Regions:
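Short acidic, S/G/P-rich loop/turn micro-motifs used as interaction or catalytic elements
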Residues: 41-45, 83-90, 336-339
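Catalytic centers of nucleases
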Residues: 1-76
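Alpha-helix boundary/N-cap detector
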Residues: 49-52, 56, 149-156, 240, ...
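Long, low-complexity regulatory tails in eukaryotic proteins
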Residues: 295-527
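Extended amphipathic alpha-helical scaffold segments
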Residues: 153-366
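Acidic metal-coordinating catalytic centers involved in nucleic-acid phosphodiester chemistry
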Residues: 60-236
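Charged, amphipathic alpha-helical stretches
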Residues: 1-4, 81-84, 519-527
Length: 527
């Protein structure tokens, strides 16, 4: 509601010590900072006794500066928000507190109250801009609300919901104004938030990350398709989503650091088949969180040294179960490369490339399952002799003849200037086809599933000049993705971790340039 009212969201609650009584921090349409303390009293009342119990938090809310450098020197408006009613005695106490602050020379420490009636009035005023009225989306939402919440987020169902509400379905583009698209982006955000109800109740942090990454990409896609300004129509919603993603990553990190043994789910023996794949995913996600914290600052409840130790100690658990795991391992490689240098680090690239072009004793390509197959699919395929071949989703799959990642991994290896190593691996590289799927348009690239596009298949020559490989590896031009996604490397990297088939060679080259400062060939080319 605040975003729809013209506020820019700066912070949304994680309930950590650094908040200083401020659950939500915004900058309103007049550039005035606002801080909100949220209290739940559904169907109830905030009594005088209840007010006294939260008095220390209210003091922090009104008197302590907002803990953000750009807002620290401007005093903020302070709001107590409750979804209940405030009793008369509590209202009188708040008025007396405000009067005392004014008498003492601190009129700026005034506490304002937003209670249930005010929230309902705001919702009524925003009307359809707050809540989607499309029956189909409500039906999809109800389907998602019955999910238990302890599994993976339902990408396919969410994709249908987002495409319908944001005008991203196949066929002619709806004739919507920018205001209508903006309204629908806000509505979609609310639907996503509601769809996470059961996942949040089970503290399923990965589901929350997945949902908000998918939403953010879809919001960018809507602006791209309707050719409207992202800054004016979707940035506020995406910024809020990014706050939620970062908070969920921090919560995931805290849980991973506190577990002993780390990352085990349920029975240790039964979990053994899934343990390393889960560990690899978490290492990739938390590697990206490390970059995020390095860029925006470390929260008080997550120590840099602890996270780095966890990431380094987990290296032995990296598991290349299929090409879908490569973006996860690349994220880890970028972290490792930033914190350590040397051939041992870049050797991880060689291991990945070697695995994608591996051959049998008869020089037949062996390779890995394509990025369209999940770990569950790969596991069912491996267990088909036990579970039955009718349960094998990959029964018709032929691996090894082509690779979605060999070309991009080769280019990253070329950037290390390992000429002799590339020469040695080239015979195996030249036996497979480089393949990628290019969606028809930039907005379709942002979707988790796209029906339209073309496959690009290239058979590498038996011999290739080193200078030609260098020229290819230097390119950091990315034409496939919209600029708002390219300009947010953290979001883009999370997007390809979730949807690895979007990690085309140009996307991998561009992301690697954003996260990896090492560059041992001539300067990059963005043209």
């Amino acid at each position: 509601m605040l975003a729809a009212d013209g506020h820019r969201i700066v912070h949304s609650t994680r309930h950590s010590p650094i908040e200083l009584g401020k659950d939500v921090i915004t900058v309103d349409a007049n550039d005035a900072p606002c801080a909100y303390q949220l209290k739940g009293h559904p169907g109830g009342r905030l009594t005088l006794q209840g007010l006294r119990e939260i008095q220390p938090q209210l003091h922090e809310l009104t008197s302590l500066a907002i803990p953000f450098p750009e807002l620290r020197h401007v005093h903020h408006r302070s709001f107590l928000v409750t979804n209940g009613l405030v009793e008369e005695e509590a209202t009188l106490a708040i008025e007396q507190m405000n009067a005392a602050n004014e008498t003492d020379g601190y009129p700026e420490r005034r506490l304002e109250v937003i209670q249930r009636g005010d929230l309902l009035a705001m919702a009524s005023r925003l009307g359809h801009s707050l809540w989607p009225t499309e029956i189909q989306q409500t039906h999809l939402l109800l389907e998602m609300l019955v999910e238990r919440g302890d599994g993976l987020y339902e990408f396919e169902r969410a994709n249908r919901m987002l495409r319908a509400i944001l005008g991203l379905e196949a066929g002619a583009r709806p004739n919507w104004s920018a205001a209508e698209v903006r309204r629908r982006i806000t509505s979609a955000a609310i639907l996503v938030s509601l769809s996470l109800k059961n996942y949040d109740a089970r503290q399923n942090h990965f589901a929350s990350i997945s949902a908000w990454v998918q939403f953010s990409a879809a919001a960018i896609a809507a602006c791209e398709r309707f050719q409207i300004s992202f800054e004016r129509n979707a940035r506020a919603a995406v910024d809020i989503a990014l706050i939620g993603i970062r908070d969920a990553l921090i919560d995931l990190a805290r849980e991973a650091l506190e577990r002993d043994p780390p990352l085990v789910e349920g029975d240790v023996m039964l979990d053994a088949a899934f343990y390393r794949a889960r560990y690899t995913l978490v290492l990739g996600l938390l590697s990206l969180l490390w970059f995020w914290c390095e860029e925006e600052g470390w929260p008080d409840d997550l120590a840099r040294e602890e996270l780095e130790a966890f990431l380094h100690e987990g290296r032995a658990q990296l598991y290349l179960w299929g090409e879908a795991a490569i973006p996860q391992i690349l994220a880890y490689y970028w972290f490792w490369r930033r914190t350590e240098s040397g051939g041992r680090v870049d050797g991880l690239l060689l291991q990945l490339l070697t695995a994608t072009v591996e051959t049998t004793a008869n020089k037949e390509p062996k390779g890995l399952p394509s990025p369209y197959w999940s770990f569950e699919d790969v596991t069912r395929h491996a267990l088909a002799p036990i579970l039955g071949f009718d349960q094998d989703p990959m029964a018709e799959e032929t691996t090894g003849r082509m690779s979605f990642f060999a070309e991009s991994l080769l280019h990253l290896l070329v950037r290390t200037n390992w000429k002799q190593v590339c020469r040695q691996v080239w015979p195996d590289v030249s036996r497979i086809q480089f393949v990628e799927f290019r969606p028809r348009s930039r907005w379709e690239y942002c979707l988790s599933f796209s029906e339209h596009g073309r496959y690009r298949q290239v058979q590498p020559p038996m011999r290739k000049e080193w200078s030609d490989l260098i020229e290819e590896a230097r390119s950091i031009r990315c034409e496939q993705a919209p600029e708002p996604l390219i300009g947010r490397p953290m979001l883009h990297a999370l997007f390809v971790v979730l949807f690895p088939y979007r990690a085309s060679p140009e996307v991998v080259r561009t992301l690697s340039r954003a996260f990896n400062r090492a560059w041992l060939i001539p300067p990059p080319v963005d043209a």
